[in-house]
């Protein structure tokens, strides 16, 4: 009771669910230009804030903050606040401001980096992820894990995907190339969209989000509409991306 969890919003929809599960108070800080506003997030953190989420790239907006900004943020929050750096889409990042975050771990024992095999590795149905952090923190996470949560099939698939890393990188490169093409086409068409760094693009249409999502679905293109906020569109094959652009 009295513990708080801080995040910028909108972001990954599971964060509020996790917060409610542990009966903590949720602190939401608005995004700035569709991007995590780390100075404002740091200002919202107090002695009762036990955890802060930083999603990089952010889901659903696809934007990133640079590693230098993350270092500054880590230096401005109390050491008693665990910072979870969610890098679910890290393989798709091409922004040179973002460097290897694991190099921050030795100097920041309150930092935990989470990654997944659900996105670039394509194993979403198997629910395989991992965390990197200080041994003491990882040990506490281990004690809360459900036994046998990652079954043998999922483990074998994850190992096979690691062994086939070159194939994964080729798929990611193809997605990034299509992301660049689709982004250019949208901007040529007058859309003002943030620079995407995930495997999707974000249409910040706010009040028209639900209507746009429904309209696209009627035209055979399924997207993820966030009512009152925007529409997230996954980068698919060239043909499907062209169908989306034509439907838009």
Residues covered by each model-derived region:
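PLP-dependent aminotransferase-like
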Residues: 1-54
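Hydrophobic residues in well-ordered beta-strands that form the structural core
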Residues: 7, 28, 85, 113-115, ...
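Active-site pre-lysine segment of PLP-dependent enzymes
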Residues: 20, 38-47, 60-83, 87-120
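Short beta-strands and strand-loop turn motifs
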Residues: 26-29, 51-58, 83-87, 194-196, ...
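Conserved PLP-binding catalytic core of the aspartate aminotransferase-like
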Residues: 31, 175-176, 180, 184-219, ...
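PLP-dependent enzyme catalytic core of the Aspartate aminotransferase-like
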Residues: 68, 72, 214-248
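PLP-dependent aminotransferase class I/II
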Residues: 110-187, 191-194
């Amino acid at each position: 009771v009295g513990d708080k969890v801080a995040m910028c919003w909108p972001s990954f929809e599971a964060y509020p669910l996790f917060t409610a599960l542990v009966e903590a108070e949720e602190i939401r800080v608005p995004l700035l230009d569709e991007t995590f506003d780390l100075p404002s997030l740091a200002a919202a953190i107090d002695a009762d804030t036990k955890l802060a989420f930083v999603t990089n790239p952010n889901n659903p907006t696809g934007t990133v903050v640079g590693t230098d900004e993350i270092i500054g943020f880590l230096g401005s929050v109390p050491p008693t606040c665990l910072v979870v750096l969610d890098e679910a889409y890290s393989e798709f990042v091409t922004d040179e401001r973002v460097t290897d975050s694991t190099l921050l771990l030795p100097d920041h024992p309150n930092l935990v980096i989470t990654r997944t095999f659900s996105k670039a590795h394509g194993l979403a149905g198997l629910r395989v992820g991992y965390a990197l952090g200080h041994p003491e923190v990882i040990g506490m996470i281990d004690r809360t894990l459900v036994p046998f949560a990652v079954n043998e099939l999922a483990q074998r698939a994850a190992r096979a995907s690691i062994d086939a890393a070159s194939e994964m990188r080729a798929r990611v490169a193809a997605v990034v190339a299509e992301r660049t093409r689709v982004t250019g086409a949208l901007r040529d068409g007058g859309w003002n969209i943030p620079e995407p760094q995930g495997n999707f693009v974000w249409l910040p249409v706010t009040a028209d989000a639900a209507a746009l999502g429904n309209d696209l679905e009627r035209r055979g293109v399924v997207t993820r509409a966030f009512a009152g906020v925007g529409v997230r569109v996954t980068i698919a094959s060239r043909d499907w991306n062209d169908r989306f652009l034509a439907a838009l």
